Regions:
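Conserved Walker B
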Residues: 15, 200-211, 215
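A basic/glycine-biased coupling hinge at the interface between accessory DNA-binding modules
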Residues: 6-9, 28-202, 213
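Conserved RecA-like helicase ATPase core segment
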Residues: 19, 23, 28-29, 213-219
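Pre-Walker A adenine-sensing motif
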Residues: 1-3
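Walker A/P-loop
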Residues: 6-26
Length: 219
């Protein structure tokens, strides 16, 4: 697996069998044996802890030049890209990232403004529906189209639309937006997409089986 460097490769093995070690050794092999520039390699993980551990291992194995390799989570990868190019989607590059408390506060305001009975329709329910939609790359317009005939879904669609408008007015993204907006950017701007495709010739994803639709599309 370490020496299979051309085309896609999926590694299936049990927990603790060394899948992550394969990624770090493959990175070293690409640089030392295949002459690949570290600048052209990306390694993606799901958690900051896993990214930190992988970064440490790669630094130890590769040494000089390893700082050019992108070793980060899906979300931190997207933040780096969006900080450079999100202005092409009508946001400022100094956008704020909303945490769960910010989201709850915003949702409370929206429900109040739309006069929604939050005893019957919980704010948490709306946030969960919006998060699930974003994981599937479903924007408010498509959500509304799919909601036809279902009262609760139509209510969710209305809230989703208001929620996204409020985020944009506040120059803010929530956690799920980070991936969704990066995919949107790549679809909208072929020049930006091409620059990253040209840079990252070798992309390795740890725990790939856990990717959702948005993460899969991003890769």
């Amino acid at each position: 697996a370490v020496m299979a460097t051309d085309g896609p490769l999926l590694i299936l093995a049990g927990a603790g069998s060394g899948k992550t070690r394969v990624l770090t050794h493959r990175t070293a092999y690409l640089i030392e044996e295949c002459g690949v520039n570290p600048y052209n390699i990306m390694a993606i993980t799901f958690t900051n802890k896993a990214a930190g551990e992988m970064r440490e291992r790669i630094d130890q194995m590769v040494g000089y030049g390893s700082e050019s390799i992108w070793v980060c989570t899906f979300h931190s990868t997207c933040v780096r890209i969006l900080r450079r190019y999100i202005d092409r989607l009508g946001f400022g590059t100094n956008f704020t990232i909303y945490d769960s408390d910010d989201q709850k506060t915003l949702m409370k305001d929206i429900c109040k403004r739309l006069e929604i009975d939050t005893k019957m329709y919980k704010e948490k329910m709306f946030l969960s529906a919006i998060s699930s939609a974003k994981d599937e790359l479903i924007d408010p317009i498509e959500f509304e189209t799919r909601a036809a005939g279902d009262y609760v879904k139509r209510k969710q669609a209305q809230v989703y639309r208001e929620y996204q408008q409020a985020l944009k007015q506040n120059n803010a993204l929530d956690f799920d937006d980070l991936i969704m907006k990066t995919v949107e950017l790549f679809k909208l701007d072929k020049e930006v997409l091409a620059s990253y495709q040209d840079r990252f010739r070798y992309i390795m994803v740890d725990e790939y089986q856990d990717t959702n639709t948005a993460q899969f599309e991003l890769i």
